[in-house]
């Protein structure tokens, strides 16, 4: 890997598994920069991470003391819990389906919540009667249909339908909303042809789409939280 490729690599990546959120430090950087990136991501998605469980911080460059300092800084500012040293009891009555990888052409259909732990490949499809969370991107050609809300950590370039059973109070949140078609209940919107490309990591500002006065409105997620 060239120096340019290393420098352009995303510094902090959030993934997930059945135990909780995994924070991956992708390359070496000063501790203060790593801490700032993690805090910024948590603040950007504060509504999603409130009450979340973080199972691990993966890093080849941080010392044990620095990781401990990161944990203390995170728990002092956010309603999150580190659970790597605890046993998480699984409740079979809690209707959530976790999917590690959704391959091209693969379909998932579930009555409860669905959590996709990686990107959705073109041709993949999720049908959920409740909420759907995607820890990566919904790529062009992928499709999500949810009876409830849809929350995406990355970008949306595929088809998303929230409130599929007629719930006009449903909403869609994503790091970047650029879907081929976005539908909430019976309201449909298509992205304009001149939609800007996916923003760089430093410019990410999560967006929320919801129905207002019979049409789909897209606003900054953070400004919506402040209202």
Curated annotation (Swiss-Prot):
<protein>
    <recommendedName>
        <fullName>Probable septum site-determining protein MinC</fullName>
    </recommendedName>
</protein>
<dbReference type="InterPro" id="IPR036145">
    <property type="entry name" value="MinC_C_sf"/>
</dbReference>
<dbReference type="GO" id="GO:0000902">
    <property type="term" value="P:cell morphogenesis"/>
</dbReference>
<dbReference type="InterPro" id="IPR005526">
    <property type="entry name" value="Septum_form_inhib_MinC_C"/>
</dbReference>
<comment type="similarity">
    <text>Belongs to the MinC family.</text>
</comment>
<comment type="function">
    <text>Cell division inhibitor that blocks the formation of polar Z ring septums. Rapidly oscillates between the poles of the cell to destabilize FtsZ filaments that have formed before they mature into polar Z rings. Prevents FtsZ polymerization.</text>
</comment>
<comment type="subunit">
    <text>Interacts with MinD and FtsZ.</text>
</comment>
<dbReference type="InterPro" id="IPR013033">
    <property type="entry name" value="MinC"/>
</dbReference>
<keyword id="KW-0132">Cell division</keyword>
<dbReference type="GO" id="GO:0000917">
    <property type="term" value="P:division septum assembly"/>
</dbReference>
<keyword id="KW-0131">Cell cycle</keyword>
<keyword id="KW-0717">Septation</keyword>
<dbReference type="InterPro" id="IPR016098">
    <property type="entry name" value="CAP/MinC_C"/>
</dbReference>
<dbReference type="GO" id="GO:1901891">
    <property type="term" value="P:regulation of cell septum assembly"/>
</dbReference>
<dbReference type="Pfam" id="PF03775">
    <property type="entry name" value="MinC_C"/>
</dbReference>
């Amino acid at each position: 890997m060239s120096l340019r490729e290393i420098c352009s690599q995303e510094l902090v990546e959030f993934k997930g598994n059945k135990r909780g959120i995994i924070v991956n430090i992708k390359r070496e950087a000063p501790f203060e920069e790593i801490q700032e990136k993690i805090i910024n991501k948590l603040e950007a998605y504060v509504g999603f991470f409130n009450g979340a469980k973080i199972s691990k911080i993966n890093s080849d460059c941080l010392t044990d003391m620095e990781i401990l300092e990161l944990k203390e800084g995170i728990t002092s500012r956010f309603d999150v819990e580190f659970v790597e040293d605890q046993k998480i009891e699984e409740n079979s009555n809690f209707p959530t389906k976790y999917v590690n990888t959704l391959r091209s052409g693969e379909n998932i259909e579930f009555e409860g919540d669905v959590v996709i732990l990686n990107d959705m490949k073109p041709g993949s499809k999720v049908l959920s009667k409740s909420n759907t969370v995607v820890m990566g991107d919904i790529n062009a050609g992928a499709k999500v249909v949810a009876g409830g809300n849809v929350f995406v950590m990355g970008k949306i370039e595929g088809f998303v339908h929230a409130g599929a059973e007629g719930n006009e109070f449903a909403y869609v949140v994503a790091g970047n909303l650029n879907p081929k078609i976005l539908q909430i209940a019976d309201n449909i919107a298509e992205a304009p042809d001149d939609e800007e490309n996916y923003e760089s990591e430093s410019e990410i500002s999560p967006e929320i789409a919801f129905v207002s006065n019979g049409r789909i409105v897209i606003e900054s997620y953070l400004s919506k939280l402040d209202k």
